[in-house]
Each structure stands twice: as structure tokens, then as C-alpha cells.
């Protein structure tokens, strides 16, 4: 997917939480999802209008998430409409009994480009304990097998915190066995139920980056690893890139880092527009205002695009042009300050070195 998008005008992707209802009770859930539908959810027609605005804005990708998007009977209708608007479409089904081969076939026929399943433990016991529903791991494995059988591109999502950061090698081996095209590694942001968990320390994050980098360079990865709320991985790669190749920009600068409100936008189940699901600052509602206007003009979104507002180490770091100042969501969740330094980064800028 091309990233020659002006992030001042449009995000690379928009995630719409089409429902907050889910039968799982995951320990980290940013939405604190419950197993009941909210009558205030956006209707199908309201969803169509949102999709129209996403396409008009120039955003190439929309993700339907939850909760469990399979709880929406109109999921296939939304997928078809988004495809008709020229968008790439992904969805993240929860691994509950609603996930069946027949439903995956239905999603595929509707035109979905990719599905993602969460894999948060290297064993059944680890995963099911984290998801707090027995059988979730088995359904994730079955869902991955169905996706492979159907030729449906598959992504695995894994949240890392202090409880499982030491299990990277085992998780990487498991994910590699599933035939995924993407592995999205999330660094915990303490929001929702996740506020009760302990994220990785800055030192643990640095060790995790080292493992991801080594895994990628060794060719052990036949898929792309994306890191969410860990933009400073780009700083790590820059530090370990070695001599530059003439005529070629390193991978970490050839694409733009995506940040909350700056390349990324989130709409919750009732239509509130936020910079990210992990940065749930409500900046308007799609029932009343266009997501285009909010993304381009709302003061919070404009500030998030202004690197000069960054404070602390992020404000003076020489790698700021590379990583963009780390995770604004984590800084806000931990400190209450939107532009504080990212507490998950251990790097000491050269200008602060004694």
C-alpha cells in the first residue's frame, strides 16, 4: 500500500468500531467490551455516510473492528459498500463461536481484503487466560486454518506487556506457522481494562525491539511485522541500520510513521471521532460533523500533527524526524499530558548527554 498520502489531509487508515459488544472479556481491552449491543450504535445508513467521507477524504483503507464485528448482521453490507467506494477493507473478528467457516466465506464473497485474529499466548493456556474465555485459542487456530484454505490474507495481532514480553520467540514461532502476511505487534497502552495491566518497561521494549529486528534480519520472517504504539522502533532500526546504501533510503525513512491523529483516525461505536482507540479524546461525532473536517481542522488533530509541541526527551531528540515522537496515546494515558515524552522509550537524546 502506498504511503504518499499527505497526513495533513487524510489518514492512511481509519478504524471504525462498528460495535463494542463481544463475548470475550480480554484483560487488555481498550473498549472494556461487554456482551450486549448498544442501541446507540451507528446504523447501516449512517455507516454508509461515514464510508463515503472516508473515501472522499482520500484514505485508502478502512478497518471494521469491535468488540466483535461479527455481531453486526450488516457487516457484509458495510464491506460491499466500502469496496464499491474504492476502499481496501479489513476486519478483526473475535474468536468466539460466531466465527465459522461459513461466515468467513460470506466475508470473502462480500470483498474483504484481509482478516485479523488476535494471538496473545504461545500456548492454549496462556492465550485463553488472557482472553478469559476457554476455547478462544482453538478457535483462533481454526480460523487461521480456514483463512489459509480459502486463500484469505491473514494478519495476527499480539499485545505485549510485562506478562508475555519474555515469550516473543515462542509467539514468533507460532505466528510464523499460521501463514500470515502481517504480524501486528501492539505495545500495551493502559486504557480501558488495560489500565489494570503492567506494560513493558522502556528497557523491556528495547529488548523486544532487538528480538524483532534480529528475527526480521535473519530471514525468519516471511511476513511483515508492524508495531503499533511503538513508533520508536524506527529509532532502533536507524541506530542499527549500518552504512547506508548509495541511492537508497533506509526502509525506516522510506515510509512515514503513523500516529494517532496524524495518519490515523478512529470512530467509535456511537460515532465519536477520536485520534485513536488508544487515545479516546472525543473531537466530534459523525452524526453532526464530517470526519474530514475533524481530521483536518479540529485543534486536537492539528496539534497532534505539530512536532514542535513535543516535550521532554521527545521534544529534543535527534530521532524525532524518524519516529515522530513515539506514542502520544501512551504519553497521555500515563501522564495525562498529550505531548509528554513516551515513557516506553529509553533513549537519551544526544543533546541531553552529559
Protein language model annotation of sequence segments:
Residues 53-56, 109, 177-180, 311, ...:
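Alpha-helix termination/capping residues and helix-transition junctions
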Residues 42, 88, 108-110, 118-120, ...:
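Radical SAM enzyme [4Fe-4S]-AdoMet core and its adjacent flexible, acidic
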Residues 12, 60, 261, 277, ...:
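Exposed loop/turn and edge beta-strand positions of beta-sandwich/beta-sheet ligand-binding modules
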Residues 1-114:
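Conserved alpha-helical substructure of the radical SAM core
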Residues 10, 148, 259, 308-311:
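Residue-level preference for beta-strand/loop junctions
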Residues 272, 278-354:
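Flexible mid-to-C-terminal extensions adjoining Fe-S/redox cofactors in radical SAM and related proteins
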Residues 2-5, 249-254, 303:
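Short, P/G- and charge-enriched loop/turn segments at secondary-structure junctions
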Amino acid at each position: 500500500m502506498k504511503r504518499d498520502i499527505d497526513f495533513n489531509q487524510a489518514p492512511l487508515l481509519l478504524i471504525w468500531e462498528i460495535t463494542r459488544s463481544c463475548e470475550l472479556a480480554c484483560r487488555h481491552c481498550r473498549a472494556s467490551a461487554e456482551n450486549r449491543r448498544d442501541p446507540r450504535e451507528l446504523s447501516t445508513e449512517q455507516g454508509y455516510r461515514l464510508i463515503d467521507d472516508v473515501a472522499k477524504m482520500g484514505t485508502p483503507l478502512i478497518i471494521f473492528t469491535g468488540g466483535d464485528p461479527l455481531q453486526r448482521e450488516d457487516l457484509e453490507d458495510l464491506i460491499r459498500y466500502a469496496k464499491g467506494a474504492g476502499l481496501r477493507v479489513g476486519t478483526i473478528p473475535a474468536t468466539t463461536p460466531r466465527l465459522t467457516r461459513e461466515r468467513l466465506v460470506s466475508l470473502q464473497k462480500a470483498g474483504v481484503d484481509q482478516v485479523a485474529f488476535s494471538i496473545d499466548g504461545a500456548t492454549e493456556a496462556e492465550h485463553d487466560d488472557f482472553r478469559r474465555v476457554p476455547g478462544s485459542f482453538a478457535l483462533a487456530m481454526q480460523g487461521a486454518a480456514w483463512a489459509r484454505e480459502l486463500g484469505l490474507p491473514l494478519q495476527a495481532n499480539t499485545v505485549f506487556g510485562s506478562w508475555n514480553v519474555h515469550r516473543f520467540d515462542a509467539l514468533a514461532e507460532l505466528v510464523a506457522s499460521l501463514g500470515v502476511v502481517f504480524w501486528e505487534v501492539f505495545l500495551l497502552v493502559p486504557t480501558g481494562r488495560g489500565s489494570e495491566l503492567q506494560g513493558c518497561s522502556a528497557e523491556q521494549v528495547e529488548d523486544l525491539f532487538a528480538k524483532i529486528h534480529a528475527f526480521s534480519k535473519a530471514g525468519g520472517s516471511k511476513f511483515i511485522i508492524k508495531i503499533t504504539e511503538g513508533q520508536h522502533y524506527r529509532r532502533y532500526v536507524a541506530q542499527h541500520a549500518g552504512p547506508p546504501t548509495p541511492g537508497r533510503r533506509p526502509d525506516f525513512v522510506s515510509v512515514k510513521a503513523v500516529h494517532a491523529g496524524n495518519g490515523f483516525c478512529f470512530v467509535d461505536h456511537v460515532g465519536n471521532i477520536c485520534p485513536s482507540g488508544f487515545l479516546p479524546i472525543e473531537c466530534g461525532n459523525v452524526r453532526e460533523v464530517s470526519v474530514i473536517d475533524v481530521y483536518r481542522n479540529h485543534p486536537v488533530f492539528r496539534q497532534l500533527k505539530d512536532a514542535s509541541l513535543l516535550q521532554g526527551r521527545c521534544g529534543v531528540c535527534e530521532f524525532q524526524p524518524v519516529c515522530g515522537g513515539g506514542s502520544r496515546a501512551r504519553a497521555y494515558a500515563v501522564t495525562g499530558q498529550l505531548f509528554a515524552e513516551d515513557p516506553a522509550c529509553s533513549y537519551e537524546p544526544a543533546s541531553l548527554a552529559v
